[in-house]
Amino acid sequence: MNLQRRSILLALSAGAALPLLQACGGGDDHEPTIVGLASGDSRFSILVEAVTAAGLVDTLNGTGPFTVFAPTNDAFAALLGELGLTKEALLANTALLTNVLTYHVVPGALRASDVQALPKPASVVTVQGAAFTVDANLAITDGRGRQAQLVSTDLTASNGVVHAIDTVLLPPAG
């Protein structure tokens, strides 16, 4: 087969395949996972480092659905000051990280409107096993009596929902 004929066949094949490829969508319009969403938002860079250090990336990339109450970098900075730790020391303590991070994850996809609809005060059980409380103003009280406010809500991921919070939640001691 000569070169000109091959070029024509290749062009026709590509033209015939184009509508099929467009119908499939190039994948660019798919929502990211929870980890992908957090990785793409500079407010959550410390959270992403912590999730990675704790070995929870695969879990939070899983099918879910999950709701993550995601502490911002400012929330982590405040916690480090409160505990007198460096970020490196926190990231090295995987048992502590896993305990704290799983306390921020709730099974199911809860939008802010779902949380608002819960009878108040609402006790929300986390995948860590302990619960935190949400009041009528959507303020969260953790297991140690510390309060967090929602900074941003309903960030949608392919496997759940993320709500940014201004405080790292701590589970009950013990």
Regions from the language model: what does each represent?
Residues 3-10, 15, 20-174:
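Mature, structured domains of secreted/extracytosolic soluble proteins
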